[in-house]
Every structure is written in structure tokens, then in C-alpha cells.
């Protein structure tokens, strides 16, 4: 809690909880864990804390918590192994962040480009209203083997497209 407060006081607009192991919890345990985490951090800092869970987690459970009017979660990040487009209709508040595959970025440039084209086409198929609240990003962050050329291309093309 103190670290979240420090980051917000230092000027962060939103602090994300990156949870890479929530998918290992049984559904009942995930509910208990989210309840405790959100009560301790999210309620203390309304609309200032977002939550990202790695693939394999039941995102419906997180959405149910996000839609709770007492929680005020700023938004949620979606792993790249899940179709992001489904979540715009499922969430009623907060942002949806993601979710180009970080592994696609590590491909040779000529193999990376068609993957990026497909992602842009899929997201462009949604109207601006349908993708309202979208924060474009990666599924789980840039890997150390990622060619810088691909990162630059990704940023430039996303900015030009949206």
C-alpha cells in the first residue's frame, strides 16, 4: 500500500498490479485473493490502480470485481493469449489494456510485420466507440531479445493507426 501511495505521490496517473501467478489459483482462492487485494489497494486509491493477470486466469472473475461499484478499479490488462476484442463488451468501466504478443515482437522483422498488420486490422475493425478505453500495449512486456527495430515499428504504426 505504501509503494502505491509513493508512486501516485510521485506523479503516476495509475499504478498497475502485474500478477503473473493468479492463474495458478483455484477459482475460490482467486476470489479470496482478489477480494483481499482489491480491498487493500484499490479501495484505498479509487480509479488509480489497475490489474493485469497473465493468461490462464478466469478474466470473468476479475471483470465481476471490476464491475463492483465499491471497487473502482482503474482498468485491467489482458494477456496476449486471449482475444482482447471480447472484453470491450464485457467491461462496463475502466480501461482495457493490451495485448499484442510480446513474442511476435521478437520475430525477424519480415515475420513480425504480418502479425502487426493483423493486430491493427482486428483492432481497426472495432469502431472508436467500441474500443473506447483501450490502452494499446503488449501482453506481458518487452522481452530482452526483442529487436529495437520491431519496437519502433510497433509504436510508429500503432500511433499512425489509432
Stretches with model-predicted labels:
Residues 1-162:
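Active-site loop segments of alpha/beta catalytic cores
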Amino acid at each position: 500500500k505504501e509503494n502505491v501511495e509513493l508512486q501516485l505521490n510521485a506523479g503516476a496517473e495509475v499504478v498497475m498490479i502485474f500478477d503473473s501467478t493468479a492463474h495458478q489459483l483455484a477459482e475460490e482462492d482467486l476470489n479470496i485473493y482478489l477480494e483481499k487485494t482489491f480491498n487493500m489497494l484499490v479501495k484505498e486509491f479509487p480509479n488509480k490502480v489497475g490489474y493485469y493477470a497473465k493468461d490462464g486466469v478466469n478474466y470473468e472473475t476479475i471483470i465481476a470485481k471490476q464491475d463492483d461499484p465499491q471497487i473502482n478499479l482503474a482498468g485491467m490488462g489482458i494477456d496476449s493469449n486471449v482475444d482482447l476484442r471480447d472484453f470491450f463488451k464485457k467491461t462496463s468501466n475502466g480501461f482495457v489494456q493490451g495485448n499484442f504478443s510480446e513474442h511476435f515482437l521478437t520475430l525477424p522483422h519480415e515475420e513480425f510485420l504480418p502479425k502487426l498488420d493483423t493486430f491493427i486490422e482486428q483492432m481497426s475493425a472495432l469502431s472508436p466507440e467500441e474500443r473506447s478505453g483501450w490502452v494499446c500495449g503488449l501482453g506481458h512486456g518487452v522481452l530482452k531479445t526483442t529487436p529495437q527495430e520491431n519496437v519502433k515499428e510497433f509504436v510508429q504504426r500503432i500511433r499512425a493507426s489509432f
